[in-house]
Amino acid sequence: FSAIKRTYHYYVHRDKDPFLRMYSCELHYDLDFALMNEAAQYLLQVSDFGAFCKSHTDVKTTLCDVTEAKWVQVSDHAWYFVISANRFLRNMVRAVVGTLIEVGRHRMTLEQFRDVVAGKNRSDAGESMPGHALFLERVEYAPESMQYNINEGL
């Protein structure tokens, strides 16, 4: 638990592609990625992510420090969401992505998105996206936690 930063990517694509279907979520609708990125930037301003925590868990705190949240276009039909934080709640990334997709489909306004986050109620947020498209991309540790002592081992 000595990691100071974790980065996840969640992959989505539009066209049928047998090579992507195991690693990316296929979507059948247009999305407004500019609006989704605007909503994602709001995540950098908040610290309580109770709205995106799996229901009925005994987590001690829903506080997280999100330092990066944005959609990146890979091609004309593929994107990924990148999010970095000091810690994540169970199901948090998939719930964030599902809620951002509601924004991108114009089913939720930016103001409603902010209200969902502020309300800290999981039932107000969007659906959790499937897990097969979520990948842990990077974990960073404090330099002092990685010091090797020859007498103690790692």
Briefly describe each language-model feature range:
Residues 1-154:
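Structured-RNA-binding interfaces characteristic of tRNA pseudouridine synthases
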